Curated annotation (Swiss-Prot):
Known function: Binds double-stranded DNA tightly but without sequence specificity. Involved in DNA compaction.
Locations listed in the record: Cytoplasm; Chromosome
Entry-linked InterPro entries: Alba-like_dom_sf, DNA/RNA-bd_Alba, DNA/RNA-bd_Alba-like
GO cellular component terms given for this protein: chromosome; cytoplasm
Pfam family name, one: Alba
One of the protein's GO biological processes: chromosome condensation
SUPFAM superfamilies with a match to the protein in the record: AlbA-like (SSF82704)
Protein's name according to its UniProt entry: DNA/RNA-binding protein Alba
Name of encoding gene: albA
GO molecular function list: double-stranded DNA binding; RNA binding
Family statement drawn from the similarity comment of this UniProt entry: Belongs to the histone-like Alba family.
Keywords: Chromosome, Cytoplasm, DNA condensation, DNA-binding
Organism of provenance: Methanococcus maripaludis (strain DSM 14266 / JCM 13030 / NBRC 101832 / S2 / LL)
Length: 89
């Protein structure tokens, strides 16, 4: 499934437009919004703007929370929170 939008450091509207594009031009029934760390709040903002303002017919199917274990520069293991929001129409 290629209908995944990874949320990072760009502005919220960039990701909102990416989700809307996936639903409209790709004719997708589901779009997954993924983020980790500090970008989690931005991913929630994207979901809220899509479902409340731009595409009210889109609903939340599932929200998954988790933790990624990544290796720090000093060799220590770091836990980073992750979120996956599955939207459908």
């Amino acid at each position: 499934m290629d209908n995944i939008v990874y949320v990072g450091n760009k502005g919220v509207m960039n990701y909102v437009l990416a989700v809307i594009t996936q639903f409209n031009s790709e004719n997708a029934q589901e779009v997954i919004v993924k983020a980790r760390g500090k970008a989690i709040s931005r991913a929630v903002d994207v979901e809220e703007m899509v479902t409340k303002r731009f595409m009210p017919e889109v609903k939340i199917k599932e929200i998954n929370l988790g933790t990624d274990h990544i290796q720090g520069e000093d060799g220590k293991s770091i836990n980073v929170s992750t979120i996956e929001i599955i939207l459908f129409k």
